[in-house]
Amino acid sequence: MQDKIRDLTQGDLSSHLYRIALPIMGTSFVQIAYNITDMIWLGRLSSQALAAVGAASVFLWIAASFALINKIGSEVTISQGIGAGRRDEAKSYASQNVCMSLLLSVGMLAIYLLFAGNLLDLYALIPSVRAEGLSYLYLSLVGFPSIYLTASFTGIYNAIGDSRTPFRISILGLATNMLLDPLFIFTLGWGVSGAALATVVSQGLVLLLFLYQVKRDKLFGGFPFLVRLHWTQIRRILQIGVPPAPLQVLFAFVSIYIGRQVSTLGGHIGVATMTTGAQIESLTWNTASGVTEALTTIVGQNFAAGKLRRVYTAFCRALSFTLIIGVLGTILFVFWGEEIFALIVPEEAAYKAGAVYLGIVGLSQAFMMLEITAEGLFYGLGRTYLPAAVSIVGTYLRIPMVLLFASWGWGIRAVWWAISISSILKGLTMLYFFLRWRHRTREERRQQSLA
């Protein structure tokens, strides 16, 4: 275990950043591939099947958002414990995060069993689409414990600087999902239900592999999964992990509201465009999120060790990389949006509508990189509330924007422009807070040197 824990307070920052970020980015792409694999096969069934899964996926996204409590909680509490030289504390936080994530998954599963139908009714779908969406949602509930525990284990490995293990395990899960999707959906004729079952089986395999790997690696000399929860540590985990979790939930609620507007303005083609377009767009923001998670770990260790100059340098190097990704995303989405969308949905009406979506949201990609990278900095500092507040306010601005732009007669484009403009505003706001933090820390260092 000792060689698995990397000291990120020493050595070349670029090397640390890319060594940790690349496997995390790979893991993010695996998650994208999970979703796009389902979309590709379901797109071959019908656009209605795609709309059904897209609507159900929003609520699965809400559930998965709560897994961030322990994923981010693990990354920050454990990395800061390692950076400060408190290994026993880091070990205890590992146990607390895993046990807490299991309890959260069971609670969320119970809530969804009771209210799944009511939640899906928020989309006002036609009966046939609603029925398929409900089937997909119910079957997906089986995978909740796997999702939550996997998120916690991933956070633990990221915190110690070993992002390769989650990547390798995720690859095996993806391979399983890609093999099972066509078998369950077409060969066995299970359709939408087959897509859900393929994903659940893959998630279960990933969890089993994590359990085996953690035991084999003897992380922190071996730590128990089921423990008595200690309020002091749980409170710290909640302080760090809770702000990003409601952020994703509230973001999903906005998506539900906007989804209703899209359904009204564009029917099931509009819903399929938004949900599929979001999966395509995730190619850029998931890449940036991989860098952000690596940045969180590096910042966590160096901040706890009092090395603020390395914190600042790590942020600048991460941002230079994500901005390149953002500019490339803009070029691809604006100029080749139709061709990209047609790879997933072969229906002409759908991929032409998708090209309009990608062309508009593509304009905001670089600004989205600013927001996401700054999140990684503030997460590592333990100040998760700041990016959460910026994102919540910026995301909720989409609602009045949609109403305003729609009143101008923009049709469904009103929704796409609201998404793009709000992303630009959030990126600029996070840049402002970063500059303010840098100025304040420089002043503090200057005062300390004078003293």
Role assignments for model-derived ranges:
Residues 50-110, 147-166, 273-331, 335, ...:
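Small-residue-rich hydrophobic transmembrane alpha-helices
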